[in-house]
């Protein structure tokens, strides 16, 4: 028998699964909401701007350090039979660490600095920086811009780095490494310092043949190239390859064998294509969760307005992966439910049904638009062909 462990880091919780590799059956699972949740309103009593969405990196290690031992103990499997561990993660969820991979927010004096914390994928505090990067790329007729939907999102890594450069240089001074949170977990597992082609390709303007676009970075800010070169750039491991074996320290901590192999991290929505078998040219998959990602594979790379990236080998080796989607789906359902009047909540409780079930009952006979209410609000930003995350209402 052989088994593998997959750890899925979503927006609100982490989920670890033990899988039988011979048949794909899930043997057991462990789910843990993040201890500190998503930090959006205030940080340690200090109010945050409305566009901030932060997390505490320690929560991610808790999922790993509690989940993996639980799976081994509850299932009774021999750790020697666990051949591999894989990580998927929301993206671009960006971490700033010291040379020992310690999150900057854990260092003395930085516990109240919001820019020292993990910038979650739906953090939109870097809109000004994204606009600057986009305009510079447009002015310089950057060829690659069309492969990112002819726009630059504040959700991506480079604008978030620029935000810290502009707003918190003291954080950058302490930072040795900037990486996707998924890369951080992989590096903690292996004791290495590598990057996945999936995260870099989709969120950092990195291309397999050309690397980072330092020529553009130089025109955006005279410090940006050096920051990316010194703190982001690292050996690349592609999807389908192996980073290496788990370190002795982490093997002992998690109860795994040192023979356990670790894969490069893959963006959470992208991993779904592997799970459902959507691995062929011209197949599209909608991955629905907190947001919804529309993903498609193709043998060729095209410039498509409105997408948020196209990267070779980021899901399946040799195929280009395309991504587009809506930034708020599950989040939007939750938002609507939370606006329910007390009478609705009381009725749902009395009938022992969820507020979602009650709301569905009340609107099931209505046609779309029948009420006359039109809403164009800001919900995690906008990833349509408009790419206008500042839209908040009708004009």
Task: List each model region and its residues.
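Structured nucleic-acid-interacting core domains from mobile-element enzymes and related host factors
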Residues: 1-4, 365-372
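Short glycine-rich, Thr/Ser-proximal phosphate-binding strand/loop in the N-terminal lobe
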Residues: 10-54, 109-113
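Conserved small/polar residues in nucleotide/adenosyl-binding loops
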Residues: 392-393
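Short, well-structured alpha-helical segments that form the helix of a local strand-helix-strand
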Residues: 352-364
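Glycine-rich phosphate-binding/catalytic subdomain of phosphoryl-transfer
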Residues: 43-61, 66-351
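Gly/Thr-rich phosphate-binding beta-strand-loop-beta motif of the actin/hexokinase/Hsp70
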Residues: 2-29, 86, 93-96, 287, ...
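Active-site diphosphate/adenylate-binding microenvironment
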Residues: 375
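Short glycine-enriched loops at secondary-structure junctions
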Residues: 32-36, 91, 184, 300-301, ...
């Amino acid at each position: 028998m052989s088994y593998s462990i997959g750890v899925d880091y979503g927006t609100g919780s982490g989920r670890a699964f033990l899988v039988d590799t011979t048949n794909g059956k899930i043997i057991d699972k462990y789910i843990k909401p993040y201890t500190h949740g998503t930090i959006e309103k205030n940080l340690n009593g200090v109010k945050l701007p409305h566009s901030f969405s932060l997390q505490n990196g320690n929560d991610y290690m808790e999922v790993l350090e509690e989940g993996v031992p639980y799976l081994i103990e509850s299932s009774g499997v021999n750790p020697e039979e666990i051949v591999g561990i894989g990580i998927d993660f929301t993206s671009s969820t960006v971490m700033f660490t010291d040379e020992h991979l310690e999150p900057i927010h854990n260092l003395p004096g930085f516990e109240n600095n919001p820019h020292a914390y993990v910038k979650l994928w739906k953090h939109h505090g870097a809109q000004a920086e994204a606009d600057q990067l986009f305009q510079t790329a447009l002015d310089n007729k950057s060829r690659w811009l069309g492969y990112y939907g002819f726009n630059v999102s504040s959700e991506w890594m480079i604008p978030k780095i620029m935000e810290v450069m502009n707003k918190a240089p003291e954080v950058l001074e302490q930072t040795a490494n900037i990486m996707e949170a998924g890369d951080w977990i992989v590096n903690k597992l292996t004791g290495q310092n590598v990057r996945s082609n999936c995260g870099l390709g989709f969120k950092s303007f990195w291309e397999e043949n050309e690397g980072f676009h330092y020529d553009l970075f130089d025109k955006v800010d005279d410090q940006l190239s050096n920051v990316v070169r010194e703190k982001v750039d690292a050996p690349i491991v592609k999807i389908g390859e192996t980073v290496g074996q788990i370190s002795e320290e982490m093997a002992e901590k998690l109860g795994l064998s040192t023979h356990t192999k670790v894969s490069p991290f893959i963006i959470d929505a992208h991993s779904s294509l592997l799970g459902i078998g959507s691995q062929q040219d011209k197949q599209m998959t909608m991955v629905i969760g907190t947001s919804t990602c529309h993903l498609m594979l193709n043998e060729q790379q095209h410039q498509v307005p409105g997408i948020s990236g196209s990267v070779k080998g980021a899901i399946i080796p040799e195929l280009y992966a395309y991504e587009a989607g809506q930034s708020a789906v599950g989040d939007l359902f939750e938002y609507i439910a939370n606006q329910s009047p007390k009478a609705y909540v009381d009725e749902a409780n009395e009938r022992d049904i969820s507020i979602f079930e009650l709301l569905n009952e009340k609107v099931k006979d209505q046609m779309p638009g029948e009420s006359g209410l039109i809403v164009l609000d800001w919900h995690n930003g906008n990833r349509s062909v408009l790419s206008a995350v500042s839209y908040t209402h009708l004009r």
